């Protein structure tokens, strides 16, 4: 299976969905999983991306193998058009006011003094997902230079007034501004709900993955469950330009597998 080098777009409301269980996700609240690319019960095949980029629209799994044997996945990039970790960069700060910049891929609105992120289907006009800041988030993550750490501080929780000031900027006014620094990137997520994972292998054997770049994964990480003999070589987990987060949670996660799992010459940045 060859993807001639190009950018390929996959939309949730034009993709296949099936009921299945994924470990470390909420398969009771969200049993119906959506897949951009789903390959089932195939043997002795190669999927060559030829340097292509798979662009995912919606909160779904980018790529999945189920019940496959002796499969090679090579030379492609996975990128989400609107990542479901929501990043806010501090660009201006005063005693009672902070201006945040939001990446261009994430749409948002301010209504009733609440900041809500969303991604809208170009076909139906309905939202693939919505997330109201701190509505489903126990804690946030701060990226400060090379430091990454968790915090209970929030851009919106103590805000007295939230105002959209531009296509990609929002201003929050406070009684006392949270102790963020200019340049900090605060990342929030819907961490009460893991409804899917980014890439998914189930009941597969002898799978080889090489020269794959992952810019982001929704819901969880790259999950392999009940598999045998997995090889990952020259993988790169790195956020797309303008972002700091490369996965909702975890990067490679292996559960209930046997044989070997080999990870070689790879780069992990999260």
Features from the language model and the residues they span:
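Generic short beta-strand segments
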Residues: 4-17, 103, 236
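Extracellular beta-strand-rich solenoid/capping regions of secreted or surface-exposed proteins
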Residues: 9-46, 55-74, 81-96, 192-205, ...
């Amino acid at each position: 299976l060859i993807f001639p080098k190009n950018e390929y777009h996959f939309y949730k409301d034009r993709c296949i969905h099936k009921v299945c269980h994924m470990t470390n996700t909420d398969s009771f609240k969200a049993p119906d999983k959506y897949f951009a690319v789903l390959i089932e019960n195939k043997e002795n095949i190669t999927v060559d991306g030829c340097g292509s980029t798979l662009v995912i629209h919606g909160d779904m799994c980018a790529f999945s193998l189920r019940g496959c044997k002796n499969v090679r996945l090579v030379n492609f990039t996975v990128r989400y058009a609107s990542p479901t970790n929501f990043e806010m960069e501090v660009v201006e700060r005063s005693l009672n006011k902070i201006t945040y910049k939001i990446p261009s891929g994430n749409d948002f609105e301010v209504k009733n003094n609440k900041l809500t992120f969303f991604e809208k289907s170009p076909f139906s006009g309905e939202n693939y997902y919505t997330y109201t800041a701190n509505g489903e988030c126990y804690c946030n993550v701060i990226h400060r230079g090379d430091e990454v750490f968790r915090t209970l501080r929030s851009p919106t929780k103590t805000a007295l007034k939230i105002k959209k000031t531009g296509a990609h900027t929002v201003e929050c006014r406070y009684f006392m501004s949270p102790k963020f620094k200019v340049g900090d990137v605060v990342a929030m997520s819907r961490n009460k709900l893991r409804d899917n994972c980014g890439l998914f292998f189930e009941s597969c054997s002898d799978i080889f993955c090489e020269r794959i770049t992952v810019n982001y994964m929704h819901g969880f990480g790259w999950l392999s469950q009940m598999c045998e003999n997995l090889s990952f070589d020259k993988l790169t987990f790195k956020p797309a330009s303008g972002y700091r987060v490369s996965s909702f949670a975890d990067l490679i996660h292996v559960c209930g597998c046997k044989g070997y799992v080999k990870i070689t010459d790879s780069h992990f940045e999260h």
